[in-house]
UniProtKB/Swiss-Prot annotation:
Residues annotated as the enzyme's active site: 148
Gene: Pik3r4
Main localization (coarse): other
Bias kind Basic and acidic residues: ranges: 1315-1326
Full protein name: Phosphoinositide 3-kinase regulatory subunit 4
Originating species: Rattus norvegicus (Rat)
WD repeat spans: 991-1030, 1040-1079, 1093-1134, 1139-1178, 1182-1223, 1237-1278, 1327-1358
């Protein structure tokens, strides 16, 4: 711009804000600094923040136009240079006070980034240096020289992408060596005196004599030296190479510049060399690169491209060239403006990224480490997006990426770059994100195996306080995550403390280090730090152990309670953990929590030691009598483990053995196995004498024969007696007066033993009935003995269940989200998982009579009674107490908690019997077996035939429904043949106070309904529209939905009306129309409120009945397509439309309900398969004009009729091929042209097959009603319109393969033909005066048209 500017003193100094008065697109934000040459400000634009550089014009003769053209050309040349950011706009103010340059704002330049935390590591510096050379190479190959490369003009984004900006071709190429004024004016904008200019640009001052003469004598005319300069020499590539070398050197010396102005001038003359600064560059290849780039002779400097090739694999890793540069360049494009998109792209490419950056097939380890370090560049992209992510899925994807990359990152990156963002996410508004952030933080910190000096206090001062609030988070899922990870967090914090302590001791013991830096020394000594850490963790552990949600407590116990014991030490493990855990057994409603206690108590007891056995003994005994059999199993397993570890004293062991021995006949298989496991472990721990003297007496009642190797599980299991029958056990356990039952059973046992002469029947009728029921279920004397052996357990369990019931009544048992199946009387269905042995038919036949008592009522109902209905009297009768089943019930081997419910179908047998080895009573005579067996089969066959008949009826119903669907009519009352409305106004209805949005007619044409922006829905009687009454009013008005009612529809075959409002409400109304013409009633039946942020309001709705479902389909503005099953009040299906193709404006459903089509605001028409809920195809209008209304074609199943924005266009599209088959064009514009001189559009469509001759009625913004005869287009006409409308004719032509019916205005008024009916008198303005919003027809004694308009008017025509 000439060197003369340096000497001009401004006549007036204005603030930079004052120059924004004439700029309308930019709003001043803040000043970025000012110099004599430029005033720099940041401004707001609709596309983002921009930098505005203002040049105050002091000399109006300056040739600014040429500079503006040069900058425009430079912008075009650098369009494809991804590392260059030229000025996007150059403007001169109208008042000619200033010239302004505009470019995108980038927050950080390289000078600021070098001194900003987190500091750049070596690989990031190499990456930035690589990009600087790449940017210079891109500019030079585009024919552009920069002229002012310095750290202030190298912009660095938050993801370390370099942008070379502020191209200074307008600044002077050459500067006088003896006068620093020009340098200060043009290049030293930072006032640091740092010089990046190539030495050859400083020339002898004689060539600037003209300027000096002017400064001495102001009367001398000023000469613009710029043109002369350009003829003498322009900017050379070598000049930019020198400047780039200075920038790279400053990057690798932590901000120490190579030259200031005086040093550069001395270097130019050979009196100075920056060796001292260059030696600070540790990397030899980088030092050699810089040395070559700052050669004093320009000819010795290479091109930027040559340096890139030369340093490939040396200063710059190979992966920069092969992967990082092309991959990262895609994020610099405008298509990736969203942080969410960047994260999703990286997650999609993660496998490829890991393969390229962390491949394990490298020949040398050093190269592998170099490639792995390239992940740091990728991490900067991820972290730059974290704070601006919008969707929950994107945030979770980012956390997933961090977790995948963390094991391959260095400690510094994990602590300095990753951890702060994870703590930021721990304060996110979405609970899922907070929970996942905590999990990710825990796993990332667990990877740190060494602690840097500056991070010695990161846990107590940063991490633990940063997540402390999560222990009291409102969301249970977050507290769950805290409970799940607090043990690992505490373990990692302790390891950090120990690593810091070890490092401190090593530093103190080194002879060369007399003093330890106070900044890196941990606060206080080790014991003090450990005590503080214990207190911080203890506070959160106690909070979690006292959480109101049991699942949080359970999670804490199941995830590292033993590690917390190690962290706290023995004393605190006993005082803090064990004392809180004991209280969990008081919760009688949550057996999962009690079970988790016994799962985790072994680890705690093992750490606390055998001293805890006296405390745990009553707790373990309580677990052995728990009401839930799962808890008993867990208590048995805990006792077994504690016995193996020697944590139980010998007297306690024998006491537990006495309590556990009766479990050997418990009906639950898992409990029996648990009891066997404990007995065998005890046998291992004690001597042989103790086994036979103390242990065997407990076992004798439950084994069939003496056993020697009692410590072997298989041996003990093989000699166990048969367990108590599950049905008998459960029935006895559920009895209210179980104590009286056991007293009577004890008396019966004494009588059998001979110690009691007689056992009178029980006096209590309830006990007598109970005993009779037990005997009828097969209770034998042996079963009675086993029940008595389990007496203590059953009494305690009965009391525990009673207490649990009482406690559930005291507390609110109907907890939110908890369904009590027992309270609902629902019985779980079970099958035995033990495979039964196949037996010969005659054996199975013999057992049928005896097994009937064990089969439940449902089995009998399904397959018939096992006992024939008419048993011959010759069969011997046996008493109840003699009848013992030969097979075992499935519940004899499993409890309700253990068995897996395989099916809820009644066909699944609940009595998969396992035959007994020894029958207890003789079988019946073989003479009656064949008939008994035959009768059972006949009963089963009858049930099977009934099932087959039921299935046949169901199949017939489905076939009829299918036929109904195939024979579905387009409309129940079509217009009469040859119907051509005359356009006579029958009724003018003005009850609505705002725009009417939709009209719908009921199936039998008895009613029609309108909805309006005034919030009302009005029901009209069609019979009163024939003009026979003097006044016509609506028969019903409904206004309780709120908001503006946008759409409505009648349900097929009913007087149910569905309506939707813009406040998100959708309601189903019932209309009692059986009393017409009397006033009917209306009442809401169902309703739902849509999420305005997630779904938005409803834009269109339809109803169809598929036989099995009555579906109300509605589309929302945010792209949701929902099928609401009105019979089950749930969604039959939900589809999600991609909003990239536009917002949904309308949709239509195929008459056979096989597919639907949606229209969008961008002209797209997308088809969905209703059977599989999958998108089929999508076609777009050539002009991408908005689809205003969609309708199915009445004759062609694959066609849709679409009303398009502009030119009154209505087109018929074959969605199977995507072809536009027929277009109705009521516009003066050339048919099918994309220009729209006519803004009018069709807003309402009515189509009818009309007995094979389809007709179409349209109405819209031109306030005309048109009748289109699709068979004979020339017979189409305007039914009703504004007064004085010119007459029109219709012609059919073929344009580009599409049939077009065009409306053409007649030049002269032609009388109506015989076929065209006359409209009403021309003088009566009967037409609408505002946009017609919808049109419909109904049939009474004749055909009628009903229209509605934006001014709230409803008109009826015939």
């Amino acid at each position: 711009m000439g060197n003369q500017l340096a000497g001009i003193a401004p006549s007036q100094i204005l603030s930079v804000e004052s120059y924004f008065s004439d700029i309308h697109d930019f709003e001043y934000d803040k000043s970025l600094g000012s110099t004599r040459f430029f005033k720099v400000a940041r401004a707001k634009h609709r596309e983002g923040l921009v930098v505005v550089k203002v040049f105050a014009i002091q000399d109006p003769t300056l040739p600014l136009t040429s500079y503006k053209q040069e900058l425009e050309e430079l912008k075009i040349r650098l369009h494809s240079a991804q590392n260059c950011l030229p000025f996007q706009k150059a403007a001169e103010k109208a008042s000619e006070k200033a010239a302004m340059l505009f470019r995108q704002y980038v927050r950080d330049n390289l000078y600021d980034r070098i001194s900003t935390r987190p500091f750049l590591n070596n690989i990031e510096k190499r990456w930035i240096a690589f990009q600087i050379l790449t940017a210079v190479d891109q500019a030079h190959k585009s024919g552009v020289r920069h002229g002012d490369i310095k750290t202030e003009n190298v912009m660095v984004t938050s993801w370390n992408w370099v942008l070379l900006t502020d191209f200074a071709s307008f600044k002077p190429t050459y500067l006088p060596e003896d006068n620093p004024a020009d340098f200060n004016y043009f290049f030293d904008t930072s006032r640091r005196r740092t010089c990046y200019i190539a030495p050859e640009r400083f020339v002898d001052g004689g060539m600037f004599a003209t300027e000096l003469e002017y400064m001495r004598d102001p009367s001398t005319p000023l000469v613009d030296l710029n043109s002369n300069q350009r003829t003498r020499g322009e900017l050379k590539r070598a000049m930019d190479i020198f400047s780039a070398g200075c920038v790279i050197a400053e990057l690798f010396t932590e901000g120490v510049p190579l030259f200031d102005l005086s040093q550069l001038l001395a270097y130019r003359n050979g009196h100075f060399f920056p060796e001292q600064v260059l030696n600070k560059i540790e990397d030899r290849s980088i030092r050699e690169l810089v040395t070559q780039m700052i050669q004093r002779e320009p000819g010795q400097r290479l091109e930027a491209d040559d340096y890139l090739k030369q340093q490939r694999g040396n200063a710059f890793p190979e992966v920069f060239y092969t992967f990082l540069q092309p991959y990262m360049a895609q994020f610099a494009k405008e298509t990736f403006l969203s942080a969410d998109e960047r994260i999703l792209v990286i997650r999609k490419d993660l496998g490829n990224i890991i393969h390229n950056l962390c491949g394990h097939d490298l020949p040398e380890k050093a190269e592998g480490e170099s490639k792995a370090s390239g992940l740091v560049v990728l991490v900067s992209v991820i972290t730059s997006c974290l704070q601006t992510l919008k969707s929950c899925d994107s945030k979770l994807a980012a956390l997933e990426l961090i977790l995948h990359l963390a094991p391959r990152l260095s400690v510094e990156i994990l602590l300095d770059r990753i951890t702060p963002y994870l703590l930021h996410f721990s304060n996110n508004s979405v609970p899922r994100v907070r929970a996942e952030a905590l999990r990710t933080l825990t796993k990332v910190l667990a990877l740190v195996q060494e602690v840097p000096r500056n991070d010695v206090n990161i846990y107590p001062e940063y991490i633990l306080p940063g997540i402390a609030h999560l222990a009291q988070d409102d969301a249970t899922i977050v507290r769950l995550a805290y409970a799940e990870n607090i043990a690992l967090l505490a373990e990692t914090a302790l390891r950090f403390l120990e690593l810091v302590q070890l490092k401190t001791l090593n530093m103190e013991n080194e002879p060369d280090s007399e003093e330890v830096d106070e900044a890196t020394r941990p606060n206080g000594d080790y014991d003090t730090e450990l005590q503080a850490l214990h207190e911080m963790v203890q506070q959160k552990v106690v909070t979690l152990l006292s959480d109101p949600e049991n699942i949080v407590k359970q999670t804490l116990m199941e995830n590292g309670i033993t590690r917390l014991c190690v962290f706290f030490g023995r004393q605190k493990a006993n005082d803090v953990l064990l004392s809180h855990m004991i209280t969990f057994l008081n919760d009688k409603n949550d057996w999962h929590l009690r079970g988790a206690f016994f799962d985790s108590i072994v680890g705690v007891a093992a750490y606390v030691g055998w001293q805890s056995s006296s405390i745990l003994k009553p707790l373990l005994q309580q677990g052995l009598s728990d009401a839930e059999e799962f808890v008993i199993v867990k208590a048995l397993n805990a006792l077994t483990c504690m016995c193996q570890l020697g944590l139980l004293q010998k007297p306690h062991v024998y006491e537990f053995a006495s309590d556990i021995a009766p479990f050997l006949c418990h009906p639950n298989l898992w409990i029996r196995y648990g009891a066997v496991g404990f007995i065998t472990v005890v046998a291992h721990q004690i001597s042989t004498a103790d086994v036979y003297c103390k242990l065997m007496p407990y076992l004798d009642p439950y084994i069939t024969q003496p056993v020697i190797q009692i410590e072997r599980k298989l041996v003990l299991l093989s000699v166990l007696k048969e367990p108590v029958s599950r049905s008998i056990f459960d029935y006895a356990l559920r009895s209210k007066d179980i104590a009286s039952l056991f007293r009577h059973l004890h008396m019966r046992q004494k009588k059998r033993n001979g110690s009691l002469l007689d056992c009178p029947p029980p006096e209590d009728p309830a006990i007598a009935q109970l005993l009779k029921k037990l005997l009828s279920q097969g209770m034998t004397e042996e079963e009675e003995d086993k029940l008595l052996a389990l007496k203590d357990f059953m009494m305690k369990s009965n009391r525990a269940k009673a207490n649990a019931v009482d406690q559930s009544h005291l507390h609110d048992s109907s907890q939110k989200g908890v369904i009590d199946l027992a309270a609902l009387g629902i019985t779980g269905r079970q099958v035995d998982l033990v495979k039964t042995k196949q037996e010969p038919d005659e054996k199975r036949a013999r057992k049928h009579v005896k097994q009937d008592s064990n089969v439940n009522e449902e089995w009998k109902s399904m397959f018939g009674s096992l006992e024939p209905p008419n048993i011959p009297q010759a069969l011997p009768k046996t008493s109840d107490h003699e009848v013992v089943p030969t097979g075992k019930s499935p519940r004899s081997e499993s409890s309700a908690g253990v068995c897996v419910p395989l099916s809820t179908s009644p066909q699944v047998s609940e009595a998969a019997h396992i035959p007994s080895k020894k029958p207890v009573i003789p079988v019946v005579s073989s003479t009656v077996l064949p008939s008994t067996y035959q009768i059972r089969i006949t009963t089963c066959k009858t049930e099977l035939q009934q099932l087959i008949q039921q299935k046949r009826e169901q199949c017939n119903a489905e076939r009829i429904a299918k036929q109904m669907m195939e024979n579905a009519e387009w409309e129940s009352k079509p217009p009469p043949p040859g119907w051509r409305p005359k356009g006579l106004l029958v009724a003018h209805l003005h009850e609505h106070k705002s725009a009417v949005n939709r009209i719908r007619v009921s199936d039998e044409h008895l009613l029609f309904a309108t909805c309006s922006n005034d919030g009302t829905v009005k029901i009209w009687n069609s019979q009163k529209m024939e003009g026979k009454t003097t006044t016509t009013r609506s028969i019903l008005t409904y206004s309780r939905i709120g908001g503006r009612v946008k759409t409505l529809t009648f349900c097929q075959g009913s007087h149910y009306l569905a309506i939707a409002s813009d406040n998100g409400a959708v309601q189903l109304l019932g209309i009692e129309a059986s009393k017409l013409p009397k006033s009917p009633k209306i009442h809401p039946l169902q309703s739902r409120i849509l999420d305005q942020k997630e779904d938005g309001c409803v834009v269109d709705m339809h109803h169809f009945n598929s036989g099995a479902q009555s579906v109300l389909a509605y589309a929302t503005v945010n792209g949701s397509l929902v099928g609401w099953d009105l019979r089950s009040s749930s969604n039959a299906w939900t589809l999600k439309h991609d909003l990239k193709s536009g917002l949904i404006t309308s949709f239509a459903v195929d008459i056979h309900q096989c597919w639907l089509c949606i229209g969008t605001s961008s002209g797209a028409m997308a088809c969905w398969d209703m059977r599989f809920q999958l998108p089929i195809s999508s076609h777009c209008h050539p002009s991408r004009a908005r689809i205003r209304r969609l309708s199915m074609h009445p004759l062609y199943q694959s066609w849709v009729i679409a009303a398009v924005q502009g030119n009154n266009e209505v087109s018929m599209w074959d969605m199977e091929t995507g072809d536009r088959r027929l277009t109705l064009w009521a516009s003066s514009a050339p048919p099918l042209s994309e220009l729209q001189p006519s803004p009018h559009s069709v807003h309402g469509i009515y189509c009818s097959p009309a007995d094979g001759n389809p007709i179409l009625l349209t109405a819209g913004s031109d306030m005309k009603i048109r009748f289109w005869d699709l068979v004979s287009p020339e017979r189409s006409y305007v039914v009703a319109g504004s007064t004085g409308s010119p007459s029109v004719s219709y012609y059919k032509k073929i344009i580009e393969g599409t049939e077009v019916v065009q409306e053409i205005q007649n030049k002269q008024k032609v009388g109506p033909s015989d076929d065209t009916p006359r409209r009403g008198p021309e003088s009566l303005p009967v037409g609408h005066h505002d946009i017609i919003t919808d049109i419909a027809t109904f049939q009474t004694t004749q055909g009628f048209i009903v229209t509605a308009s934006r001014d709230g008017i409803v008109k009826v025509w015939k």
